[in-house]
Amino acid sequence: MEKKKIVVTAGTFDILHPGHYEILKFAKSLGDELIVIVARDETVKKLKGRKPIIPEEQRREMVEALKPVDKAVLGSLKNKLEPILKLKPDIIVLGPDQTTFDEETLKQELAKYNLYPEIVRFRGYKKCPFHSSFDIVKEIIRRFCSKEIKI
């Protein structure tokens, strides 16, 4: 029996949007099983200076419910690499806006643990108006923070 090709990607996934779905479909197309690491609330606060709008467990559940995703797990509070070391993926897909690691640094860090997955940077967002959480929040503010709005 041939070993399943495991693909891992990671992100915050706060306010799911079409861009998230695009990267998940792409990641799944590269292998047999897609496991998504969802960033912890505390980690997001450290990186972005604010907690996510949607709590971590709800974000994990929503991501896991998406068709391309086989499993979603929460990231580690201690070591960003911990879930990857446990999962031992064949491929890691980085999003276009992920800056925690660049491809080379990630390869070097994982090599210290004798892990040598293929690392792929996703660059293929379709041109849709709402492929980022920030764009969605800006549009909500534009639409609902004017005086003419009647709710």
From Swiss-Prot:
EC numbers for this chain: 2.7.7.2
Transmembrane segments: none
A Gene Ontology BP annotation from the UniProt entry: FMN metabolic process
UniProt key word Repeat: no
Binding site for ATP: T12, F13, H17, P18, G19, H20, D97, Y125
Keywords assigned by UniProt, alphabetized: ATP-binding, FAD, Flavoprotein, FMN, Nucleotide-binding, Nucleotidyltransferase, Transferase
Cofactor(s) the protein needs: a divalent metal cation
Catalytic activity: FMN + ATP + H(+) = FAD + diphosphate
Keyword ATP-binding: yes
Pathway: Cofactor biosynthesis; FAD biosynthesis; FAD from FMN: step 1/1
Enzyme's top EC category: transferase
MF terms (GO), sorted A to Z: ATP binding; FMN adenylyltransferase activity
HAMAP family xref list: FAD_synth_arch
Alphabetical list of PANTHER family matching this protein: FAD SYNTHASE
Role noted for this protein: Catalyzes the transfer of the AMP portion of ATP to flavin mononucleotide (FMN) to produce flavin adenine dinucleotide (FAD) coenzyme.
Family to which the UniProt record says this protein belongs: Belongs to the archaeal FAD synthase family.
Quaternary data: Homodimer.
UniProt-recorded name of the protein: FAD synthase
Native organism: Methanocaldococcus sp. (strain FS406-22)
UniProt lineage: Archaea, Methanobacteriati, Methanobacteriota, Methanomada group, Methanococci
